[in-house]
Swiss-Prot record:
Belongs to the heat shock protein 70 family. One of its GO terms (molecular function) is ATP binding. Induction: By heat shock. Gene3D superfamilies: 1.20.1270.10, 3.30.30.30, 3.30.420.40, Actin, Chain A, domain 4 (3.90.640.10), Substrate Binding Domain Of DNAk, Chain A, domain 1 (2.60.34.10). The gene is hsps-1. InterPro entries: ATPase_NBD, Heat_shock_70_CS, HSP70_C_sf, HSP70_peptide-bd_sf, Hsp_70_fam. This is Heat shock 70 kDa protein.
Amino acid sequence: MAPAVGIDLGTTYSCVGVFREDRCEIIANDQGNRTTPSFVAFTDTERLVGDAAKNQVAMNPANTVFDAKRLIGRKFSDPEVQADMKHFPFKVIDRGGKPVIQVEFKGETKVFTPEEISAMILQKMKETAEAYLGGTVNNAVVTVPAYFNDSQRQATKDAGLIAGLNVLRIINEPTAAAIAYGLDKKVEGERNVLIFDLGGGTFDVSLLTIEEGIFEVKSTAGDTHLGGEDFDNRLVNHFVQEFKRKHKKDLSTNARALRRLRTACERAKRTLSSSAQTSIEIDSLFEGIDFYTSITRARFEELCQDLFRSTLQPVDRVLTDAKIDKSQVHEIVLVGGSTRIPRIQKLISDYFNGKEPNKSINPDEAVAYGAAVQAAILSGDTSSKSTSEILLLDVAPLSLGIETAGGMMTKLIPRNTTIPTKKSEVFSTFSDNQPGVLIQVYEGERQRTKDNNLLGKFELTGIPPAPRGVPQIEVTFDVDANGIMNVSALEKGTGKTNQITITNDKGRLSKEEIERMLAEAEKFKEEDEAEAKRVAAKNGLESYAYSLRNTLSDSKVDEKLDAADKEKLKSEIDKIVAWLDENQQATREEYEERQKELEAIANPIMMKFYGAGGAPGGMPGAAPGGFPGGAPGSNDNEGPTVEEVD
């Protein structure tokens, strides 16, 4: 049984780590990369996840899904979902008030929820860990932005279930990064540490005090919809306008052209973190026009300056909430790829009166590192001294309360309350002889509930007739360590109770839906494995035929073989190669059958050459898939399948 892992499920990239024998290892995927793109692609023949999906995005923009984290746990009507849909090349539709993604897969129209797409990415991270650890991985800690609300957390937990994971805990990304920093630094005395986490799609700021293994979050703030993707969008829009000016054509009407431009913009943005200027060269971008241009760092900073500046508001808020002056912050730790942007580093440094931020931890891996440590702790691994002393105290990011007369929000749990927590308050009826009360639970900071987010509601009925203000109804809020909440109400006179686990009113997937999705995920996994075996059989046959052809052209072999045998074998090889060209989509069994036919002719002929010493199949690549590139998974994405694309 493999140990528990920590998974950073990111908007644009994901990362998995394991903590064992007193050290954390970040695990590379099958392409050798320590982060995996959070992309899932659907084609006519297969489903691709990670690098393979991102690599083919320009050829298949409408069926390549990314940014599921920007949709998860949100309503379709959410203005941010509506704004994102304008940028997405794939189709997002409304199903019961929730956004779902519609794609073409194996010739059919399929619909997937953001939870299912996220589950596919989690499953990929699970498989990456399993390949490295050599066992089944069941338990994981999954991270979310600190500013994720209740429904987004619950939906992320559901995604873990669909991926076949037991989610030990949902933890906040900046808190995970703080653990990575704290363990790495062996912090002495009490330190106030500000974590500034700006990733591909989300932004968090948390202020913690770290002292002797106790990580106490004092306050947190952020924007669940700000990150590197938004900077890419600014660049894309800038170049679309430039293309219009230069060529009088609007390339935004073409999904493929937009995708190629976006990929170039993402690369340019990264280059501008280390160079003052970079060029973009895209051949035949739109209607045969080559697009060659350049951009300076100053221009990029100008295009994004309002977004960059907006990152300081949450910093302000975190310090105010924690009642700490900026001069009392000992360390500023940068997390997330977007903190490599020099302008952002300068803004932070200026804000803290010239104090340089700490860059000692890897911004791409810190969150997975901290999650892996937390996974080791929660799965009871106390073998390491560093983990046995850690205590995490996190907070609820948003105030929680109920609606009282006049549509007012009465807060029971103010924001930045340490969790887990439990709080009760007594309410009463608003009118005489009122038989029941409707309890509506909200999260948010505004005075009126209509400006806050409704999490759920339930009724408490059967209250005996009494004048207003007499019945005593005790409402209890209970927030667990994942930041997910239970609310119960008790009428003290009759002892009647009712309760609700706030799992995103209406939007939450039901148990049946999760089970159906889990079964579907298993089915997709089996299909993926079958496809890998089919490709391996095809590669095996191809490499066997070609290696035989090479053997025949070798002069040593040529001399010793009978002309008739040689002719017979040559024509059979030509026949197989021609058949392969015609049948790229044949079944695994057909390829294996052809391999057997070829072996039946080749083996006796080659036996003559090797004399009695050469056992059948004793030559290179004789066994199916026994040739470089033949093993499943070794070359799935760039093997001989390249010839299918015309």
